[in-house]
Regions:
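N-terminal export/membrane-targeting signals
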Residues: 1-23
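A beta-strand edge to alpha-helix "cap/lid" segment located at domain peripheries
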Residues: 22-68, 73-161
Length: 161
């Protein structure tokens, strides 16, 4: 056993030297933590705020909220048929509606999946479009989360009775 002791010590020294001589690997940079998923209540609050910005834009004849929140591939469904985002922007710019005030109520959010939702609600406006009173509507807007931003991709209105 004694005759193997110097050999064992030499092997241990060689192993230790090899282990110490290895290049230290830098620790990986911590990757940014992804934003935590929003709760349904947080999504509803955000989408209601967006919907109100769109109604404010309509009331004030301001196309900016529509450029900001309505997707380029969106579709609108009204009593006149379907319209694109470009049609909607032309309609806002033409200013055919005079809206004094509006009220949105009875919100309901339906989650399709974590990146798509339908916000439905009742809209009542004090105003006219084309000289006719604006009727109360039941409306729904479908939103899709693209790159972390909720975009309106479809909107429809039906007269409320």
């Amino acid at each position: 056993m004694r005759k193997y002791l110097p050999l064992v010590v030499a092997l241990l020294l060689a192993l230790c030297t090899t282990a110490l001589a290895q290049e230290a690997k830098p620790s990986p940079e911590p990757s940014p933590k992804p934003k935590p998923a929003m709760s349904k209540a947080q999504i509803q609050k955000a989408l209601i705020a967006t919907e109100k910005k769109l109604w404010e834009g309509w009331k004030n004849k301001d196309p900016k909220p529509f450029r900001t929140w309505v997707a380029n591939d969106s579709v609108g469904i009204t009593d006149h048929g379907t319209e694109t985002k470009a049609d909607l922007l032309k309609e806002i710019a033409a200013g055919g509606c005079e809206v004094k005030s509006y009220e949105l109520s009875d919100f309901k959010l339906t989650m399709i999946n974590s990146g798509a939702a339908i916000l439905s609600y009742k809209g009542v406006a004090d105003g006219t479009c084309g000289g006719q009173p604006v009727p109360p509507t039941w409306s729904s807007t479908t939103y899709v989360n693209r790159g972390g931003k909720w975009w309106a991709v479809a909107h429809q209105e039906s007269p409320a009775k």
